Amino acid sequence: DSTRLAGSIEGFIGYAQIPIGVAGPVRIKGRYADGEFIIPIATTEGTLVASFQHAFNVMNRCGGALAACNRQLVGRAPCFVFTDLPTAAAIADWLPTQFEKMQAAAASTSRYCRLQSAKISLVGNTVYVMLEYATGDAAGQNMVTLATQAVCEALLPQMPHTPVHWLVESALSGDKRSSAQAFLGARGRNASAEIVLPSRIIGRYWRADAAAMANCWNQATVGAAQTGAVGMQGNVANALAALFIACGQ
């Protein structure tokens, strides 16, 4: 029934189907998730599900993984352009005094969106404001855009100097881009996990050497750094994409 998709897609012609496999259970001991979990994986890449399962089997033999989700932030970064540097610098000094007003403006747009911080940076005649929000259980992309619009509109009449022009998003937030901002702040939920893999387990079940694996990671990290890569992990993109697709994201 295409009418159910009104507002969600244009030029609708049908659906794409991707096969979904499952791997698990995997044992997780987290601050919020604690137990054994089955992981859905949408893919046509042969051996991906099997690789998950092989890893989970070894993880479970080591007692599972420890995990924590310690931040949940979504950013928007407006910028204001002024006639010259001294004017912009004056605004950069003034903006931190308006944080409570920014919070009130953001809160007026949503029951869930709350402004957590505002980080100011000055580049030439332009002031950038990195606004970070908590958005409850929502991804919050539209939510934080509306909140940022309200914040800017509340600030503009009070500014000691009127900007030549301004943008609701300057790309400083890192939205839809691989950037260091994800490490410096957060882009959604910030999660960490830890597992200790004894050398004897690695040797028995992976037929590998722990020291050789560590050396490989070190060398690959240096290689990735030469390309300017932001992520230094071992090819998690395929697995994450498969998980996101299976979960409807």
Each language-model region and where it sits:
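Acidic/polar, glycine-rich intrinsically disordered N-terminal extensions of enzymes
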Residues: 1-41, 51-56, 69-73
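Short glycine-rich or small-residue beta-strand-to-loop segments that form or flank ligand, phosphate
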Residues: 9, 23-27, 40, 77-83, ...
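Short beta-strand elements
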Residues: 24-28, 37-41, 127, 183-197
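Short helix/loop capping segments that flank catalytic or ligand/cofactor-binding pockets
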Residues: 29, 35-37, 47-52, 89-91, ...
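Long, charge-patterned amphipathic alpha-helical coiled-coil/hairpin "stalk" segments used as oligomerization
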Residues: 38-68, 99-106, 239, 244-248
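A structural-propensity feature for long, helix-poor, extended segments
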Residues: 54-99, 103, 177-218
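Intrinsically disordered, low-complexity linker/loop segments enriched in Gly/Pro
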Residues: 69-71, 77-152
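Glycine-rich anion/phosphate-binding loop at the beta-strand->alpha-helix junction
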Residues: 133-249
